[in-house]
Amino acid sequence: MIVDYEKDPRAKEAIAIWEKGVLKEKDGSMSDAINFYRSALKIHDNVESLYRKKILDEWMLHKKLSGLSMTTDAPDEQNETGKDDLSVEENAELQPCWILEILPDDILLRIIKKVILMSGESWVNLSMTCSTFSKLCFHDSVPFKTFAKYIYSKQIYDKMAMDLNGITDINTFEKEIWRGDDYRMLRERPYIKFEGVYISVVNYVRYGSNAESSLSLLKPVHMITYYRYFRFYENGQCLRLLSTDEPSAVVKHFSKENKPRHSHMCYWSLGFDYDFGHLKITRSDEKYTFIEEFQIKNQGNKRYQRLKWLSSIVVDKEGNASNCSLRNEKSFFFSRVKSFKDPG
C-alpha cells in the first residue's frame, strides 16, 4: 500500500523527525541522528522510503520548473541579473540527492569502478544496497573487467612454469583462454589476496610419560596448538611466521617493516597446474632451500580463500631433497585486515 505522505499526519511527522536525523548525520552527530531515526521509525515503520520518495518528488518538480523557466523569455536584463540570495538558497535546497534517478548508468558505473579499486568487499557491499546497484555491479561487464584487471595485474607467475607451457606473455595467454570473458576468468582463475593474512591453525595431541615414581596407569595428554601465518606482497615477497601466539597478538603488527621474531621473508609465485591454482613459496638460508607448495581453493562460497598443502621440501646445498611430513598440517584460510589496504 502506497502512503500519501502529504495527507497522512503520521507520515508527515515521521518524515520531519527523519530529516532532523539527516541534518545531524551531516554534522557528524551520529548518536543524535540515530535517536531521531529511531523516533521516526516508531511513528512510521516505512519512513525511510517515504523520505526518499519526498526527495525524489521535490527533484522532479524542480526539473519541471526548470524546463518551464527555460521556455519563458526574460522580462528584462535587470531581472535576469538581479536574482537575490534567496533564489540561490532555494536552488541549493532543491539540489538532487536521489542519485539513481539523476545520474545515468555510465556515471554510476564509474562510481562502481572506484569502489572496486577500494576493495572487492566494498564492491559486494555496494551491490546489496539496492536492486539498481545489484544489477549494475553483477549484470554488467564493466565491474568484472575492472576487478579482473586490478587483481590479475598483481599476480606473479613462475618464469620456469611459463617457459614449460610455452607462454611468453600472460596477457596474451589469458585472452586465448578466456577470450575477454572476465566473469568466467574470475570464476576459473585463482589469485592471491593481499589485503589480509592467511592463517593455519594446527591442533594435535601428544602423549606424555609418567614420572618413574608414578603409580598411575594413565599417561598425560598434551594438546599442542600452533599457528602459521602468510602475508603476501605484490612485489613477490611473502612474510612467513610459525608461532604459538594467537592471531589477536600477531596480525595487527604483522608486516615486513615490523618483522616478528623468528619470521622469514620468502618469495612466492604461481604456476599453471591445479587449474591455475599452483602456489609455490620459497626461502633459503646458508644451508638449505625450503620449498612449500599449495593449491588455491575455495572455502564454501568464498572464492580462492583457502591454501591446501601439497608438499613441503627441504633441499641442501648438494641438491639432496627431503620431504617433510604434512600429517599434522592444516589448510590456510584468508582473513581480511582493513589496515593492510595499500594507501597508494
Swiss-Prot record:
One of its GO terms (biological process) is SCF-dependent proteasomal ubiquitin-dependent protein catabolic process. Coiled coil: none annotated. InterPro entries: F-box-like_dom_sf, Hrt3/FBXO9_C. TPR repeats lie at residues 14-47. It comes from the Eukaryota. It holds the Pfam family FBO_C. Disulfide bonds: none annotated. Keywords: TPR repeat, Ubl conjugation pathway. Residues 98-148 form the F-box domain. Pathway: Protein modification; protein ubiquitination. GO terms for cellular component: cytoplasm; SCF ubiquitin ligase complex. GO terms for molecular function: protein-macromolecule adaptor activity. Substrate recognition component of a SCF (SKP1-CUL1-F-box protein) E3 ubiquitin-protein ligase complex which mediates the ubiquitination and subsequent proteasomal degradation of target proteins. Probably recognizes and binds to phosphorylated target proteins. Interacts with SKP1. Component of the probable SCF(HRT3) complex containing CDC53, SKP1, RBX1 and HRT3. This is F-box protein HRT3. The lineage of its organism: Eukaryota, Fungi, Dikarya, Ascomycota, Saccharomycotina. The gene is HRT3.
